[in-house]
Structures are given as structure tokens and as C-alpha cells.
UniProtKB/Swiss-Prot annotation:
Family: Belongs to the cytochrome P450 family.
Record Pfam families: p450
Gene: cyp133B1
Species of origin: Xylella fastidiosa (strain 9a5c)
Cofactor(s) listed in the protein's UniProt record: heme
EC number(s) from the headed UniProt entry: 1.14.-.-
Designated name of the protein: Putative cytochrome P450 133B1
Protein's UniProt keywords contain Cytoplasm: no
Transmembrane segments: none
Keywords linked to the UniProt accession: Heme, Iron, Metal-binding, Monooxygenase, Oxidoreductase
Gene3D superfamilies: Cytochrome P450
GO molecular function, one term: iron ion binding
Phylogenetic classification of the source organism: Bacteria, Pseudomonadati, Pseudomonadota, Gammaproteobacteria, Lysobacterales
Binding positions (heme): 348
InterPro entries from the UniProt entry: Cyt_P450, Cyt_P450_B, Cyt_P450_CS, Cyt_P450_sf
Length: 402
């Protein structure tokens, strides 16, 4: 198996057959110099919790882009984000924003998520059909993030376009030269935008997420300007396509299992379980990476220090050793902990908010549009990404009678 297999058109349409092959070749598959991959649930979970497995962001970029990666401003910016670094710097940076994503703070966002969903549906409810990605799934999380940051909602579309250009950074297969230029330009545009906003919040602080970040920074260790900008942008990136793509993936999974869709519509109190099961079945985040900080032994195989390990979360979530009938969607499933948000010290900080957003988005759609039906279920336009998996468009009939 090669890293380029993850950019194969057949894989991008349906990655799960390759994941089955990957799980059968345990413990690891070599995908290049100093690079391994695994999709077994037990191994993925164990390595996510292993303190000898950490982040070596530039090493993982060198695997994909060669030694010149360390000199690229885009990757230098990402290397300052707390999701790409190790303790103690990781602990400090994560702590600065953790207070905004506690259970209580996340739950307090539920009314905002519900209101945002209703407002978006108001714009297209009377139409016979609509592209739900463009009209709902993409603007929904971006508008929530903008409100959390007290950013002008009128800028949401521009910010979303810039973030989407950067999103391919998270793919295991390398971007083309043109894609890299577009991503770098988009990041610079975001950096300029948030530099102005951060300076404004320093002189006129509020109760928003950026002001909270700056207040926490003032009370603790000082950060460089570039560190602050990178981590504010990281919050924007982390909360956007992870959620927007998952709204589409969940609707697709449910419509491909009509009995499960009918069950959910008959009892919307099942929504939290349904969201978790859809995340397991076809999550937007398909993989994460760790690097061996020291030589470690895994199931009798040596993983040398510096080795980058691709942990395929999507494969782990379909592992029959962990989940009975893993290729079936079952919204009443109670077994197993899904890997969609990772685990260990880098477990997704915003997972509670993501779950609330997904619950509110889908519940409001089904309440307001009970006859919503996907129009082209067998001809979906997947976004050609092996990570942040989703569709570019999702045409739905809003008032179908059967």
C-alpha cells in the first residue's frame, strides 16, 4: 500500500473496502520511508493514548512534501497550532481555550445552533429543491463560529471559502503545486483579517471567543503574535468542514438506510444516538497522525523513533472486532466508543459543541422539512478528499410526498 492509494478515485468515493484490507494487514502497513499506517481499532486507540506517541508536524509534512516543507510559511503557521504540538506547550495553549468548550459552555450554545438552523431554513423552505450543502450545511457551522468570535456574519462566506482552500492540508496525499499556492494565499488572507480583529479586541475586549483567548493569555505565559493568530485561525478551521461535511454524510447514511431514517423521524429523542452512529459509520474526519517520540514496540514490531504513523479513524470505526455488523447503520447501537474525535491528550476539544451542532441541525431539518428527500443518492459529488470527507453538493427535494 502507498500513500497515493488514498487519492485513488475509487477510494475517494468509498474508502471502506481499502480499510478492510488495511485492517487485515496488521499491525502496520508501510506506506513510505519512516511512515506506517494502521486501521485496527485496538491499535488506533492504544496509540492515541500512548504518551510515547506525539506530534511531529513537520516530520509528517516532510513525508508528504519532502525536506523543503519546513521552509513553507503555511506549514510553519500550522506548526504553531496547539493541535500540532506536544506538552508542555500544548498543555498551555489548549488550556487557554478549554474554558470556552466545557460541557456547560457548549450546552449554552444550543439555542444559538437552533436559531441559526431555523434562520437558514427560512431562506429556502418554500423552494421545491435546494443544494443543502450551499444553503445549509456550509453556512450553519461558520455562522455559529462567527457569532462565537463576534465576527461580522457578512464575512462568513468569505471566511468559509478561505478555510475550504486550506482544508486539503489535512489530506494524507500531498497537494498539487497550484493547490499549495491557493492554500498559502488563503491562509495569508485569514492571517491579515484576524490580525486586525485581534488588535481591535486588545483595545475593545468583549465576551467573545477571541477576547477570552486574549484575557487568558494575559493572565499566563505570553504568546507571540504569530502564535495567537495561528491558534485563532485553528479554531475557525477546526469547527467548519468537520461539521458541515458531517451534516451531509449523516443525511446520506440515513437515506441509504431508510428503516433507520424512519425510526429516527418517528422518535427524534434518538437523535444523540443517531449522530454518534453516523459519525462512526461515515465520519468527516477519517484519520489523524502521531509520531514515535522514542523507539516503541507494538505487537512485537519495532516502531523506530521519528516514525510517522497514520491512524485511520474511519477504518477503526468499522472494525468488526469492536463493532458488531460495522457496515450497517444502527441508530440504537450502544456498543463501542467511536474514534471520530480521537483520544488521549489531543482528543477533540470541541467535540461537545460538534455533537450539539449536529443534533440541532438534523433535528431542525426533520422538524421543519418532514418530507425532505435526497434527489441523487446514487450519483453523489464527493469532495475528492481522503480526510474531511464529504460531498460538494447535496440536492434535496424539500416537499417530496414519497
Amino acid at each position: 500500500m502507498k500513500l497515493t492509494d488514498l487519492s485513488n478515485p475509487a477510494f475517494l468515493e468509498n474508502p471502506y473496502p481499502l480499510y478492510e484490507t488495511l485492517r487485515a494487514q496488521a499491525p502496520f502497513v508501510s506506506i513510505g520511508p519512516n511512515a506506517l499506517m494502521t486501521g485496527r481499532y485496538s491499535l488506533v486507540d492504544s496509540l492515541l493514548h500512548n504518551r510515547n506517541m506525539g506530534k511531529k508536524y513537520m516530520e509528517s509534512m516532510r513525508v508528504r512534501y519532502g525536506d523543503s516543507a519546513a521552509d513553507m510559511p503555511l506549514f510553519q503557521a500550522f506548526s504553531r497550532m496547539f493541535i500540532t504540538i506536544n506538552p508542555p506547550a500544548h498543555t498551555h495553549l489548549r488550556g487557554l481555550v478549554m474554558q470556552a468548550f466545557t460541557g456547560r459552555e457548549s450546552e449554552s450554545m444550543r439555542p444559538l445552533a437552533i436559531d441559526t438552523a431555523h434562520q437558514l431554513i427560512d431562506n429556502f423552505e418554500q423552494k421545491p429543491s435546494v443544494d443543502l450543502v450551499a444553503e445549509f450545511a456550509f453556512p450553519f457551522p461558520m455562522q455559529i463560529i462567527c457569532k462565537m468570535m463576534d465576527v461580522d456574519i457578512g464575512d462568513a462566506v468569505t471566511l468559509g471559502i478561505a478555510v475550504s482552500k486550506i482544508a486539503k492540508v489535512f489530506d494524507p496525499s500531498p497537494m498539487s503545486a497550484d493547490e499549495l499556492v491557493h492554500a498559502s494565499t488563503a491562509y495569508e488572507e485569514l492571517a491579515q483579517y484576524f490580525t486586525k480583529l485581534i488588535e481591535l479586541r486588545r483595545t475593545h475586549p468583549g465576551t467573545d471567543l477571541i477576547s477570552m483567548f486574549l484575557r487568558a493569555e494575559e493572565d499566563g505565559e505570553k504568546l507571540t503574535h504569530d502564535e495567537i493568530v495561528s491558534n485563532v485561525i485553528m479554531l475557525l478551521i477546526a469547527g467548519y468542514e468537520t461539521t458541515s461535511n458531517m451534516i451531509g454524510n449523516a443525511l446520506i447514511a440515513l437515506h441509504r438506510h431508510p428503516e433507520q431514517l424512519a425510526l429516527l423521524k418517528s422518535d427524534l429523542s434518538l437523535m444523540p444516538q443517531a449522530v454518534s452512529e453516523c459519525l462512526r459509520y461515515d465520519g468527516s474526519v477519517q484519520f489523524t497522525m502521531r509520531a514515535a517520540m522514542d523507539d516503541i514496540e507494538v505487537e512485537g514490531e519495532l516502531v523506530p523513533r521519528g516514525t510517522v504513523v497514520f491512524l485511520m479513524l474511519g477504518a477503526a470505526n468499522r472494525d468488526p472486532a469492536q463493532f458488531t455488523h460495522p457496515d450497517q447503520l444502527d441508530i440504537t447501537r450502544k456498543q463501542g466508543r467511536l474514534q471520530s474525535f480521537g483520544a488521549g491528550i489531543h482528543h477533540c476539544l470541541g467535540y461537545r459543541l460538534a455533537l450539539i451542532e449536529l443534533e440541532c441541525a438534523l433535528t431542525t431539518l426533520f422538524e421543519r422539512l418532514p418530507h425532505l428527500r435526497l434527489a441523487h443518492l446514487d450519483a453523489l459529488n464527493w469532495n475528492q478528499r481522503s480526510n474531511l470527507r464529504g460531498v460538494n453538493t447535496l440536492i434535496v427535494d424539500l416537499h417530496a410526498k414519497n
